């Protein structure tokens, strides 16, 4: 018995040493894990601080102007680095996804947000290399039918947030919350850049002469235009035309007073607006609402708040605080403007025919209300702008966002949509009711 105990004792001692060593290694592993968590936390705090510093650096030159209006919680949003985070999200969007992950990843996203992949072109999600390609997917031919008779058609898939007549220069964001038309479209005096864009006419209308395009769509042009330079040449007056061109903003200011003088407008015309919200699961490209000529674009650098219906009901001045691009021109009934608005994680707004436009770029923001402006007058010596046919693709977002339409139309124009209605590209937005006399 004594011998047995003597044999066991060393074994127990060895076990104790191994147990002690195991505890030491365990404590070491816990220490390493804690260190990793600590470094990760420090890194995240550092990244957040860097993002905040970037946004603060960009906003250095912003002066007091249009302010956030809403509960105190929304003022907290102004301190968040939404522009930088959206820029980082754009980088993530372009990371190539491994082939084996695409079906489950895009399938899960489609299920959560209700994407209709049967109408996508291509409908095989394995062909989308990254999130950006998936978000900006095209539709199969014939997936959207463009109404040939409506004066204005729906420019994007989404939900109607609001619509109506612009009165007193104010648009209604939601009931009880309005924002200024002048602030939405900009003041000519606040332009930071003017330059002429020589953009060739669209490839899909080479068989239609520019004069015919103008006549068919009721767009006025002068005899001097018709006898002027051939398309493709740069007229000597383009520079002056770019600098001295009739200020389209004056059309909106006059419109608010029912005193229309621009583009042959009549005093019986009114100014209307419509706001379409694109959810994350919607088709992300937007199209021309009518046959019109785009004369200029104004790029407003700004915030990137969410533009969801929840935010629209609570945050005043939402669409004039956010980054946006205002395309402005004329159509059959007068003034026309299409304004794609950026949002959180949707800093990138692409305009198909304007490759020089870059949104949500790093750099200091100018004073509130200022914008970069480019004119398209040298695109056509006849039309003095870039022609678009109804249904033409205009551009895209990289995630859900909002499109605002501001347009002139006769007083007997009536909307064919309802607030909160789900709509698709090409459906009629409204009609002009035939006069009874």
Swiss-Prot record:
Signal peptide: none
Active site residues according to the UniProt entry: 157 (charge relay system), 287 (charge relay system), 401 (charge relay system), 401 (schiff-base intermediate with substrate)
Residue ranges crossing the lipid bilayer per the database entry: 39-57
Function: Catalyzes the formation of phosphatidylethanolamine (PtdEtn) from phosphatidylserine (PtdSer). Plays a central role in phospholipid metabolism and in the interorganelle trafficking of phosphatidylserine. Together with psd2 and psd3, responsible for the majority of phosphatidylethanolamine synthesis.
Site (Cleavage (non-hydrolytic)): 400-401
Presequence range in chain numbering: 1-18
UniProt note: phenotype after gene disruption: Impairs growth on non-fermentable carbon sources (ethanol and glycerol).
The record's free-text note on cofactor binding: Binds 1 pyruvoyl group covalently per subunit.
Entry's family note: Belongs to the phosphatidylserine decarboxylase family. PSD-B subfamily. Eukaryotic type I sub-subfamily.
Subunit architecture: Heterodimer of a large membrane-associated beta subunit and a small pyruvoyl-containing alpha subunit.
CC cofactor: pyruvate
GO process annotations (BP): phosphatidylcholine biosynthetic process; phosphatidylethanolamine biosynthetic process; protein autoprocessing
Gene, per the UniProt record: psd1
Protein name: Phosphatidylserine decarboxylase proenzyme 1, mitochondrial
PANTHER family for this protein: PHOSPHATIDYLSERINE DECARBOXYLASE, PHOSPHATIDYLSERINE DECARBOXYLASE PROENZYME, MITOCHONDRIAL
Keywords for this protein: Decarboxylase, Lipid biosynthesis, Lipid metabolism, Lyase, Membrane, Mitochondrion, Mitochondrion inner membrane, Phospholipid biosynthesis, Phospholipid metabolism, Pyruvate, Transit peptide, Transmembrane, Transmembrane helix, Zymogen
Catalyzed reactions per annotation: a 1,2-diacyl-sn-glycero-3-phospho-L-serine + H(+) = a 1,2-diacyl-sn-glycero-3-phosphoethanolamine + CO2
PTMs per UniProt: Is synthesized initially as an inactive proenzyme. Formation of the active enzyme involves a self-maturation process in which the active site pyruvoyl group is generated from an internal serine residue via an autocatalytic post-translational modification. Two non-identical subunits are generated from the proenzyme in this reaction, and the pyruvate is formed at the N-terminus of the alpha chain, which is derived from the carboxyl end of the proenzyme.
Annotated metabolic or biological route of this protein: Phospholipid metabolism; phosphatidylethanolamine biosynthesis; phosphatidylethanolamine from CDP-diacylglycerol: step 2/2
Top-level taxon: Eukaryota
Residue intervals on the Mitochondrial intermembrane side: 58-437
């Amino acid at each position: 018995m004594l011998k047995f105990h003597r044999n066991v004792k060393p074994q127990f001692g060895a076990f104790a040493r191994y147990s002690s060593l195991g505890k030491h290694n365990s404590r070491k592993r816990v220490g390493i894990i804690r260190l990793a968590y600590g470094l990760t936390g420090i890194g995240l705090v550092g990244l957040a601080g860097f993002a905040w510093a970037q946004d603060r650096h960009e906003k250095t030159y912003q002066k007091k102007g249009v302010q956030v209006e809403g509960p105190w919680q929304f003022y907290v949003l102004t301190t968040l680095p939404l522009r930088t985070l959206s820029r980082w999200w754009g980088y993530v969007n372009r990371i190539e996804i491994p082939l084996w992950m695409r079906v489950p990843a895009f399938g899960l996203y489609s299920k959560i947000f209700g994407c209709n992949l049967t109408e996508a072109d291509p409908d095989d999600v394995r062909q989308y290399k990254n999130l950006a390609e998936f978000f900006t997917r095209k539709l199969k031919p014939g997936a959207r039918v463009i109404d040939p008779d409506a004066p204005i058609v729906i420019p994007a898939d989404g939900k109607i947030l609001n619509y109506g007549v612009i009165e007193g220069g104010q648009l209604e964001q939601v009931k009880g919350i309005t924002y200024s038309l002048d602030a939405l479209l900009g003041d000519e005096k606040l332009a930071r850049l003017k330059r002429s864009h020589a953009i060739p006419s669209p490839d899909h209308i080479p068989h239609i002469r520019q004069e015919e395009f103008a006549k068919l769509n009721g767009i006025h042009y002068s005899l001097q235009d018709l006898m002027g330079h051939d398309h493709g040449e740069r007229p000597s007056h383009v520079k002056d035309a770019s600098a001295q061109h009739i200020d389209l903003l004056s059309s909106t200011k006059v419109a608010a007073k029912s005193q229309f003088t621009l583009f042959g407008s009549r005093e019986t015309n009114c100014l209307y607006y419509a706001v379409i919200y694109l959810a994350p699961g919607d088709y992300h490209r937007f199209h021309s609402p009518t046959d019109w000529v785009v004369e200029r674009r104004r790029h407003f650098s700004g915030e990137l708040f969410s533009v969801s219906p929840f935010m629209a009901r609570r945050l005043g001045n939402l669409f004039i605080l956010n980054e946006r691009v205002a395309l402005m021109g004329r159509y059959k009934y007068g003034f026309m403007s299409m304004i794609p608005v950026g949002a959180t994680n949707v800093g990138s707004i692409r305009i198909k025919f304007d490759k020089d436009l870059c949104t949500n770029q790093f750099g200091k923001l100018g004073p509130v209300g200022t914008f970069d402006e480019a004119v398209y007058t040298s695109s056509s010596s006849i039309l003095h702008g870039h022609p678009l046919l109804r249904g033409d693709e205009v551009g895209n977002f990289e995630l859900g966002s909002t499109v605002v339409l501001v347009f002139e139309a006769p007083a007997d124009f009536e909307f064919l949509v309802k607030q909160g209605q789900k709509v698709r590209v090409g459906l009629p937005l409204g009609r002009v009711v035939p006069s009874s006399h």
